[in-house]
Amino acid sequence: MRNALDEPQTIVVLGGTSDIGLAIAAALSGPATRHVVLACRDVDTGTAAAAALDIGPAEASVVAFEATDTASHAGLVDDLAERFGDLDVVVLAFGVLGSQATFEADPAAAAAAVTANYSGAVSVGLAVANRLRTQGHGRLVVLSSVAGERVRKANFVYGSSKAGLDAFAQGLGDSLAGSGASVLVVRPGWVASSMTAGLDPAPMATTPEAVAAAVVKALRAGRRTIWVPGTLRLVFAVFRHLPGPVWRRMPIR
Amino acid sequence: MLTGWGRTAPSRADVVDVDDASLAEAVASAGARGALVRGLGRSYGDAAQNAGGTVVRLASPTRGIQLDTSTGLVTAHAAVSFDELLRHLVPRGYFVPVTPGTRFVTLGGAIASDVHGKNHHVDGSFGNHLRSMSMLMADGATVELTEESDPELWWATIGGMGLTGVVVEATFAALRIETSRCVVDTTRIDDLDALLATMAEGDEQYRYSVAWVDLLATGKHLGRSVLTRGDHASVVQVTGHRDPTAYGPRMLAAVPPGVPNLINRASVKAFNEMWFRKAPRRLVGEIQSITRFFHPLDGIAAWNRVYGRHGFLQYQFVVPFGAEAALCGVIERVARSGDASFVAVLKRFGPGNPGPLSFPMAGWTLTVDLPAGARGLSELLRDLDDRVLDAGGRHYLAKDSHTTADSIRRGYPRLSEWQEARHKADPGRLWISDIARRLELIG
């Protein structure tokens, strides 16, 4: 159970090696936090990440999680609740960026990435939502992206998976209205992280720590959607309505 | 969505309104997330919530109070409020043996929290005056409980946060009074040392004693306060007053929903200054009404809304006598933070009772309201918790909404004894609440 200061007792990061997910876990951890669970594909990397995590007196645990193995997700969430009690905050942070050029050359690889980013999120998101509904409380934080707000030709496979995820998360949040549980959709811009290592930063680039701070604030305020940085909301309000010929010629990658 | 009086950490439960006849069935049909009974929702934190489970609200019957004037014993339904009790008892020359700072608590809630009042140093807490309880157990049976019949369950229930069963009816010893007025001595005190000395010296001469401390005053004014002490007035003392046993408290105002947070340093400072200045330096034998002396905030409905949507915490702890340094440290730390809202309450407790989870113990108890949205609150509370626990003190479960399972284990060394008694009464873990989950009360 979270306390009056909104400090969660149990935090689960799905995609437990994600820089943003780890930063959110660290920022949310307070004196009342008992468990931080990193659910990730590569348990060894997760264990290293857990060791480096600054979460105060809380105990870090690592569990195996494969986003594309959708059949395992309901069981995984049950196990988490069994082992750690009520889940106060679950962060859905996994995703693959991939390379647009590779996807265009290898459609099967594109489908695999989309399966992880979208189908995996749908399956585990629903499983988590069912658990939170049963609990009568809890928050699901979904890492969407501005890339899904208006999809660009430079990364439309990734962008389309995030567009789907964003729509799914919004609908899931609406379906939880009145249940005591809620969903926060986070739309960061370009984030300097291991996912974007080696790429040139886009304008208005941000950091995992800045995203985490915005998430903590939004959870306290009971927000449903946030952009990081907040100005991207205005930028994309314009982008969304640009005519196609203009959008295609925009000098953005 | 349910919250406590502090309006923090809401959770959803299936709320079922029942009467005595339908109570057992409603409880029996609770699902895996268990059941809990809720009274008037005046505990500040999550004590009367059960996320995802069943929350039962028991209706108070119309003829719920019986007073036996030959023994002074009162038998009442657990859903009866202290408001109803006082309206019934005071005109008949009786008073509740212990009243908290609000009369909007139920008898059942008063037992579950083992409430205390301004007379703790003389009379102990509510459980000390309880004679018997009728309780619905987890297995569906109703038992008549006295201290003699099952001391373990008796003391596990007093202060047991409703986690041993549902008290349906209880009998307690009422206090005989001559009038519905109090005779009160008020003293304005300029600093903390003088306050502690005055209370330690003179409290025993009064049935009721409490000090209101300005926690925004710092430096040489640290701990400046107004000490009020008194007792029920005799008929002679109210000669000239109309109808000596009249009692009819009214609502004076209500805070509307949706007001923004009105509590900030400027507003609190202005209020505290006004309140300290208007108190007489020394006034002896003032006649006050029960409402003014015991329940001053009850005249304003929904006063908890003044903290806006973030709500607030009421931080209450006790440290044993001899730990005055820790008490002063806490007061100083709160004063330095500048987060304290309105006046804080300081009181000397007498010895505690055998309830393993009953809060009071011989020592000093301080209560301070803190807005939940205040910056740096988490660090402040952690610092205060350490000071309290290191001094051998503990937190009041009925008020708590922030602390941790470790803090409770340290503050209540007999927790495991309580857990065993509870487990015997409810091996299937039917009774559960948000506070029980948050503080891992149920072993």
Where are the model-predicted features located?
Chain A
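Residue(s) in the substrate-gating loop at a strand-loop-helix junction
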Residues: S145
